[in-house]
């Protein structure tokens, strides 16, 4: 059974949901576009929790009703009740665990769009080929989710591979899903260039950064040095007759970003500034995380980039996420963007971990009060 404290928190969320529902029908709110969107967004953010709470209550009512029938004089009713309880009782504990997960504080960046950087690591040309496949995997996943993807910068490699690529992905709560992709992705397979049929291991690094607004990060124009140059294609050849590509250097940190995908220098500069703000925002986020808990090595919800988070084993048609001990097969589907189950496994694992840590914190606080 859920503890009284957990039930109290869930009931408070339900009460807030009812208040927000009433506000949406208030003419004063309906006539104010910004206020209406804010109320609707908050309501949508807790609707799933309220739906699960009400389904849980209904489940308990059904269990209680069928347990009462076990004492009925009619043997047929008793037998039916036993059959129902055999199906209902196993649903109670998973429903309770799910409700607890809904109480985990949300990452304030979850609603943000993201910038994804993909780089070929160890493995030469094979790493570049896999980097191109990983990039396509994210593009296909974004398409499945109805998100928008823009290629901001790319550096081509041999055989159609990619040395590095930068994408922006925008849509509904993009960071809440893609944040689990940060880290080193390892591939094991026989490369197309391997004549002996030997299995090689290559790596690709992925960095996912929440897109930062100007209100999140203030960049002093005097700290930014801008260079312009002609856009180049995958083979290094010039593909533009004007200096439309932009390179920005943030002098205090040494961060360098560039964008050459647009024909307009102004558009490239705008996109490059977006990349720079995201990198500076990530640095500040990392600083705050370290300050909160300098002893913890794991970075919940961000992914440690020095860690091999996932292995794609093609000879065995198997994907393994090492952080959450999750394994699945059918790599062709995975590389075509069918990765929602992997992301869900990561989300559930880290939410449960955060819930345990929060519970330990509350228990410690209770002991200190006692």
From Swiss-Prot:
Question: Cross-referenced SMART domains, in alphabetical order?
Answer: PCRF
Mind listing the UniProt keywords for this protein, alphabetically?
Cytoplasm, Methylation, Protein biosynthesis
Reply yes or no: does the keyword Cytoplasm apply.
Answer: yes
Q: What is its main location?
A: cytoplasm
* Source organism, top-level taxon: Bacteria
Task: Give its localization.
Answer: Cytoplasm
Composition bias, kind Basic and acidic residues: at what positions? 286-296
Q: Which residues carry this modification: N5-methylglutamine?
A: 237
Please describe the post-translational modifications of this protein.
Methylated by PrmC. Methylation increases the termination efficiency of RF1.
This protein's name: Peptide chain release factor 1
Q: Which organism is it from?
A: Anaeromyxobacter sp. (strain K)
């Amino acid at each position: 059974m859920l503890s009284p404290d957990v039930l109290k928190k869930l009931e408070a969320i339900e009460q807030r949901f009812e208040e927000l529902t009433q506000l949406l029908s208030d003419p004063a709110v309906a006539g104010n576009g910004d206020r209406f969107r804010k109320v609707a967004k908050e309501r949508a953010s807790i609707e799933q929790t309220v739906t699960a709470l009400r389904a849980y209550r209904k489940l308990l009512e059904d269990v209680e009703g069928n347990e009462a029938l076990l004492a009925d004089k009619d043997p047929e009713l008793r037998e039916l009740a036993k059959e129902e309880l055999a199906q209902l009782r196993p649903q109670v504990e998973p429903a309770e665990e799910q409700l607890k997960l809904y109480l985990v504080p949300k990452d304030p960046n979850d609603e943000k769009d993201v910038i994804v950087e993909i780089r070929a690591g160890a493995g030469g040309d094979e790493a570049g080929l896999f980097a191109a496949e990983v990039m396509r995997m994210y593009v296909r996943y974004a398409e499945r989710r109805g998100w928008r993807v823009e290629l901001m910068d790319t550096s081509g490699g041999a055989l159609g591979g990619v040395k590095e690529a930068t994408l922006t992905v925008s849509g509904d709560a993009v960071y809440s899903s893609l944040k689990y992709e940060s880290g080193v992705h390892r591939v094991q397979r026989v490369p197309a260039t391997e004549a002996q049929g030997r299995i090689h291991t290559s790596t690709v690094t992925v960095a996912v950064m929440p897109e930062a607004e100007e209100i999140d990060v203030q960049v002093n124009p005097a700290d930014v040095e801008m260079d312009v140059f002609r856009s180049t294609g995958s083979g290094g050849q010039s593909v533009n007759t004007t200096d439309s590509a932009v390179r920005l250097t943030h002098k205090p940190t040494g961060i360098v970003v560039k964008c050459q995908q647009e024909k307009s220098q102004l558009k490239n500069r705008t996109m490059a500034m977006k990349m720079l703000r995201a990198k500076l925002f990530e640095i500040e986020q990392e600083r705050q995380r370290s300050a909160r808990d300098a002893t913890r090595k794991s970075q919940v919800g961000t992914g440690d980039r020095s860690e091999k988070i996932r292995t794609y084993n093609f000879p065995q048609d198997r994907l393994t996420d090492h952080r959450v001990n999750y394994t699945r097969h059918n790599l062709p589907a995975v590389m075509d963007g069918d990765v929602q189950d992997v992301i869900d496994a990561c989300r559930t694992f880290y939410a449960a971990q955060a819930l345990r840590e929060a519970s330990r914190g509350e228990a410690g606080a209770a002991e200190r009060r006692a």
